[in-house]
């Protein structure tokens, strides 16, 4: 305190102005509080508790303590609160001791002075192990089975739509090099403006190197016109993810919009084709179940008299006719053997 009293008034005023506003006024609402947890209570504990040096170090560093040093320690403590929330959010660990260890290790890595490390560790221990809003939400709100199934189904549908959109939506880029060393990039992105319009727009991006480093680029975007006029030129097409130009017009993210941007056809044509395809498939499925009338085999039941007549007077002989010997053939040869000579 004697050193503070001996300071000139201008220097003391500069120290008071240089102190961070966190030490004098409560901080504003944290936008990351819903995800990481609220740290207001932890920061209030940091401001209320004395974060000065330990009693063993009071005689050595007591003379050098100033409002600025206290503000630095309070800032380190508040940073420890936030580091604990970040470690808990990243690790998702149910063991608070593991998160405390990670937070203290982060404090040691962030600060060099021992007093600041201790203040940061104090912030780690002051932050609650679980966010209070999340605890209240778990107690008050019971999970619903139907709602969870609905959320799962909606998440699955969104994943399928996003994967289809990522597969369908692509950008074609044309690269040309002029005589003066400039590289002209033609990038197409089909956009359907009205129901009767087919095609897309074409944007010309002129890229110029300004220096030896690849980062020194000068990009100029120039809308050229409809894409149908440029398709006549035979240019080598190369798909690339570099030098992409985002469209300023809002685009829909549904399946028909993706197919419309991909093919350049209006949405109503794609919807009609899809509807007609479904009707044709239904008609084919129903037509295969009905067989032609000529292919049916009709069996009429026989009466008792018809059955007897069918058995007694058959239309065909039951036995094959006997075979008659041919008259023109030679008589059989009779062989006589002398048994005494054998």
Swiss-Prot record:
Keyword Transmembrane attached: yes
Native source species: Homo sapiens
Parts of the chain that traverse the membrane: 268-290
Major location category of this protein: Golgi
Motif Microbody targeting signal per record, residues: 340-342
Compartment annotation: Golgi apparatus membrane
Gene Ontology terms describing biological process: branching involved in ureteric bud morphogenesis
Record family assignment: Belongs to the TMEM59 family.
Tissue expression as described in the entry: Expressed preferentially at high level in the brain.
Listed GO CC annotations: Golgi membrane; membrane
Glycosites: 97
Signal peptide: 1-24
Membrane disposition: Single-pass type I membrane protein
Keywords from the named record: Glycoprotein, Golgi apparatus, Membrane, Signal, Transmembrane, Transmembrane helix
Role noted for this protein: Modulates the O-glycosylation and complex N-glycosylation steps occurring during the Golgi maturation of APP. Inhibits APP transport to the cell surface and further shedding.
The protein's name in its UniProt record: Transmembrane protein 59-like
């Amino acid at each position: 305190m004697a050193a503070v009293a001996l300071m000139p008034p201008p220097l003391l005023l500069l120290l008071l102005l240089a102190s961070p506003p966190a030490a004098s006024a409560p901080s504003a609402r944290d936008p990351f509080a819903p995800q990481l947890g609220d740290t207001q209570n932890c920061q209030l504990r940091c401001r209320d508790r004395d974060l000065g040096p330990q009693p063993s170090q009071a005689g050595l560093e007591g003379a050098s303590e100033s409002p600025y040093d206290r503000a630095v320690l309070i800032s380190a403590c508040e940073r420890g609160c936030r580091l604990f929330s970040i470690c808990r959010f990243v690790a998702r660990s149910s063991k608070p001791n593991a998160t405390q260890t990670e937070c203290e290790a982060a404090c040691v890595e962030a600060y060099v002075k021992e007093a600041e490390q201790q203040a940061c560790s104090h912030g780690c221990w002051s932050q609650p192990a679980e966010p209070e809003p999340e605890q209240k939400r778990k107690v008050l709100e019971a999970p619903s089975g139907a709602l969870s199934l609905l959320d799962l189904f909606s998440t699955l549908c969104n994943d399928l739509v996003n994967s289809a959109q990522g597969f369908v939506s692509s950008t074609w880029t044309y690269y040309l090099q002029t005589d003066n060393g400039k590289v002209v990039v033609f990038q197409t992105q089909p956009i359907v403006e009205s129901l009767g319009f087919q095609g897309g727009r074409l944007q010309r991006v002129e890229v110029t190197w300004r220096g030896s480093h690849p980062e020194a680029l000068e990009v100029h975007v120039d809308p050229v016109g409809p894409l149908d006029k440029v398709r006549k030129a035979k240019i080598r097409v190369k798909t690339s993810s570099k030098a992409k130009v985002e469209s300023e017009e809002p685009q829909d993210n549904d399946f028909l919009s993706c197919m419309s941007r991909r093919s350049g056809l209006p949405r109503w044509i794609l919807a009609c084709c899809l509807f007609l395809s479904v009707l044709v498939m239904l008609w084919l499925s129903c037509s295969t179940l009905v067989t032609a009338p000529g292919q049916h085999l009709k069996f009429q039941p026989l009466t008792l008299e018809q059955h007897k007549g069918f058995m007694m007077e058959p239309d065909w002989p039951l036995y094959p006719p006997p075979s008659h010997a041919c008259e023109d053939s030679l008589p059989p040869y009779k062989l006589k053997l002398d048994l005494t000579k054998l």
